[in-house]
C-alpha cells in the first residue's frame, strides 16, 4: 500500500492492538511486539499514523533503530509525535553515531516547519550530552525561551545535563537556579555535573542545598549516589562516612545502587576495610556490587584478593558485567597473572564483550604489561573506534617493553587520528624520548603538552624533567623542576637522577638534602640515585651513611638495587675485598647481579684472582650472559691459564649462551641511524667507515694509543681481539 494513503481513523479492534503494542514497547518485548505488528498489517491499520508512530516508538525502544527509521520514512505527513518517537529512540541509544543522527533529524524537522515540543527538546539535549557538545543544544535552548517552554521540568533537567556534560557547569547552574521546580533527577544531574569535573566542594554545596529543600518522602537515592561518586580521595573519607550516616537515617540502604556507590566510595578513598564491610552487609548484591568490590581490591593493590573475589562471584552464579571483567583484568596485569588473563580473555569472548571498548582496553593493557605486545596489538587493531585510554595503553606498553621507536610511531598515528592525549599519554611519550635520548623530539613533545593545555603538574612535570636531564640538558630540566607545583617524590627523584647521571654528584646530594629539608620523604628510588651519585664521586663513607639511613631513619629495607649500588661504590673506589665481603654478607636473594658487578670491577682494576673467584661463582650459578664468559676467559688468558680459557668457552657453548652483537645508534635530523658489529647494510656504511678511520688517526695524533684487551670473543670465523682507546 502506498504511504500516501496513511489513514487517521481508529476502530475498537485496532485501538486494542495499539494498547498491546504500547505495552510491549514499555516491556521491550520484541517478539510479542512483532506479532502485534503482523496483526496490524493484516487489519490494514498500519496505514494509520497513530499506529505508525507507536511502531516507530516500539522498534526504537527495542534497539531496532534501522527498522524504526524505515517505518518513519514511510510516513508522508509526519507530526511532532513521529519525529519525537525516532529522536527519542536515537538519543536513548546513546553513542556518537546515534547522537549525530539526532542532530540531523532535528535539522530536517525544523526545515519542514514542524514545531518541536518538550519531548523533542529533551531528546536533543540528551544527544548533545552524549557528544559532550552544546552547539546545536544552544540553538535548541533559544527555542525553549522563544516557545516559553522554560519551566518544563523534563526539558530543563535535560538542558542542565547537556551543559554539565559539555563542561559548561556554570551555564548548567544558571538554568538550574532559574528552574521553578526541581525533582531528584534535576538535583542528581547538577551534583554529577560538578562531580565528574572533580569539583567536590561545589558538588557538596548543591547536595547540602538539596538536603535543606527536599520534600519528606521524596526519592533521593539518585542524589546521594551522585554526591558519593565525587568522593574519590583519602581526604574525603570522613565526609563519605557522614553521608553514609545520613543514608542510614533516611532508610536508603535498601537501594542497591546506593550500596554500590558506598562500596565504590570507600574503595576510592583507600578505606578497603569499610568497603568490605559495606559489601558484606549488602543483602541484595548485583553484578555492579561485585564489580565495585573487585575494582576496589584492584585499585588498592590487593590484586590477588580481586582475583579470589571474582572466583567467588563465578561460583555464586553471578553473571559478570564488562566492568567486572575490566577490574579482574587490571588485577591480573598488576600481578602478572598472564594465564589467568588469557582465561578471562576467553570468558570475555564467550560473554560477547570483545567489541566493548573498556574491556578491550583492559585486555590490551594486560597483554602489554605481560610483554605480549603482538597480542596487545591484535586487540588494539580489532577496534574501529578507539579512545585515548586505548591508545595510551598500547603506547605505554611499548615504552615499558623498551620498544620506544614503535611507541613514538603510534603517538604520531594517534595525533593524525585526531585523538587528544591525556596526562598518561604525554608522560609515556616523554619517557620514550628519555630512553632514546632524543632531545629535539622531546622538545617537540614538550610543545605538544603546552598546545594541549597541560601544566607542569605530576606526571607531566617529572616526565619533562627526566627527559631533559637524560638528554643532557640539565638547565632545562632544572627549570622545569623548579616550576613544577606540588612536587611529589617522583619529581625530586627525576632531578636527582638527572644530576647524578650527568656527573653532577655534588649537586645531586645537595638537592637530596633540600628534599629532606622541605619535608618530602624519600623512597627506594631516591636512595638508588643518591648512592649512585656517591659512587660516581667516590664518596665511600657518605654512601655507607645513606645506605644505613634507609633502614635506621626512614624505615625502608634495602633492595637488590641498593646492594648493587653499594658494590659499585666499593668497586669503583678499589675496595674489591670489602665488596666481596659485602656480597657474601648480604641477607637478600640478589641472584647474579652483584657478582657480575664485582667481576667487571676486578677486570678493570687488574685483580685477577678475585675476578676468577667472582667469575667461577657466576658460572656455578648458571649465568646466561655472554659478558660473564668473555670477561672470565680474558682474566684466565692474562694469567696464562689457557686450559681454563677452553673450559670457559666449552661451558658457554654447553649452556647455549651466544655473544650478543654490539649495537649503537645516533639521532641526526630527527632520524635514527642504527649500527651493529659487522654491519654492511647501512646505505652510508662506506662513508661511516672512512670517518671512523679519520677519527682514529686524529686520536693517535693527539696522543691516544691503541691498547689490545686480552678478552677473547669467540666467533664462527675464528678468534677476534677487541680494542679500545685510552689516554
Swiss-Prot record:
Residues 594-669 are annotated as: Type E motif. GO terms for biological process: lateral root morphogenesis; response to temperature stimulus; RNA modification. One of its GO terms (molecular function) is RNA binding. Keywords: Repeat. Gene3D superfamilies: Tetratricopeptide repeat domain (1.25.40.10). PPR repeats lie at residues 13-47, 48-78, 79-116, 117-150, 152-182, 183-213, 220-254, 255-285, 286-320, 321-355, 356-386, 387-421, 422-456, 457-487, 488-522, 523-553, 559-593. This is Pentatricopeptide repeat-containing protein At2g33680. The gene is PCMP-E19.
